[in-house]
């Protein structure tokens, strides 16, 4: 076949996008005795496919915190990804395990299976007395439809129990009293808990466009994702949630600097007899994953105690100027200057008032 430089470059990028590959170099070597033939050699430098992290911390609110995670992107040399995460503190316990096979079929169909358990006594370290316990699992398939695009479909099952007390916020007490299967639990000494238990079956669908030149530490290309989840009829609570993210990497000044632009939008609404999104489905703003410089999960609506409660609409955007590092560290770490903007809203609380604060009413002629 004729040598196509564009196809060779594309093969190089495909290899670079593997999470366990650090660098790829291409060499065209002439075949001895045949001046019209060349051998295309790919020199691949691998990165460590396994990542392990763990820590012990202490805070005034959470007390002793234990956390650990194991991620292996080339498990037993199969190319499969296995991830285990453990987090345990005074107010939250999170455990999850997932397995992803990127080539479940010869056509490149991906399958991901995951299970999770969480027990969260408080939404944030400053939240009121409110407990969420849930366990569930997800099966998700991804279907490539072009070089850069993938469609995904799956099903999630979640069993949840939410518990509040007379010391909880008004929002928490209202939600458990009006959704799912409410119950009252008397634990003695005059203490009464109000709770609800419910099962949800969520259909999930997504679209991904990814033209980045690397899966880790990309410096050019675009990544877009849109995900939609819908709690189907038959679930004890019904809702939908949609999320869109856009990330663009723009190389600058001889490819030594990179401008990264990221935006994220999210919205969710309760459906049917459900009065509001389940509290654990609310969006939160602030912290390293959304609006840096603000306390984690501290932006947006407040509960009746003036503490973060989350909202059903998320708007956030980040701009990073990624600074050049020595070649030794360029593929292992990044430093950047950033500017973030965003917030979380609750559309159920939107009202229109005049300049004196009086509510406005509009009556058509």
Predicted regions and their residues:
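Gram-negative/organellar outer-membrane beta-barrel architecture
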Residues: 2-218, 222-223, 289-308, 312
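C-terminal transmembrane beta-barrel domains of outer membrane proteins
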Residues: 18, 64, 69-71, 81-101, ...
């Amino acid at each position: 076949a004729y040598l196509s430089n564009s196809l060779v470059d594309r093969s190089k990028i495909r290899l670079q996008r593997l999470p366990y590959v650090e660098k790829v170099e291409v060499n065209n070597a002439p075949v001895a005795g045949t001046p019209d033939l060349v051998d295309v050699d790919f020199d691949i430098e691998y990165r460590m496919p396994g990542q392990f992290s763990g820590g012990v911390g202490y805070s005034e609110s959470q007390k002793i915190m234990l956390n650990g995670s194991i991620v292996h992107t080339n498990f037993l040399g199969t190319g499969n990804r296995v991830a285990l995460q453990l987090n345990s503190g005074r107010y939250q316990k999170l455990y999850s395990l997932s397995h992803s096979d990127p080539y479940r079929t010869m056509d490149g169909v991906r399958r991901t299976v995951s299970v999770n358990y969480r027990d969260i006594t408080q939404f944030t370290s400053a939240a009121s007395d409110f407990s969420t316990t849930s366990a569930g699992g997800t099966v998700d398939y991804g279907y490539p439809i072009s070089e850069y695009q993938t469609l995904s479909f799956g099903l999630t099952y979640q069993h949840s129990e939410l518990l509040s007390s007379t010391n909880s916020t008004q929002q928490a007490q209202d939600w458990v009293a009006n959704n799912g299967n409410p119950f009252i639990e008397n634990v003695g000494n005059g203490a009464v808990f109000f709770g609800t238990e419910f099962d949800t079956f969520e259909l999930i669908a997504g679209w991904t466009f990814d033209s980045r030149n690397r899966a880790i530490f990309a410096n050019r290309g675009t990544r877009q994702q849109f995900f939609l989840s819908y709690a189907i009829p038959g679930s004890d609570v019904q809702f939908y949630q949609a999320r869109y993210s856009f990330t663009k990497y723009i190389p600058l000044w001889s490819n030594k600097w990179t401008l990264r632009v990221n935006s994220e939008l999210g919205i969710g609404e309760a459906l049917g007899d459900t009065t509001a999104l389940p509290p654990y489905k609310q969006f939160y703003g602030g912290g390293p994953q959304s609006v840096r410089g603000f306390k984690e999960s501290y932006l947006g609506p407040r509960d009746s105690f003036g503490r973060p409660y989350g909202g059903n609409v998320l708007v956030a955007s980040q701009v990073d100027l990624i600074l050049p590092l020595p070649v030794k560290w360029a593929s292992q770490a990044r430093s950047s200057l950033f500017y973030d903007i965003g917030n979380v809203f609750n559309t159920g609380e939107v009202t229109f008032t005049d300049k004196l604060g009086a509510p406005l009413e509009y009556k058509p002629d």
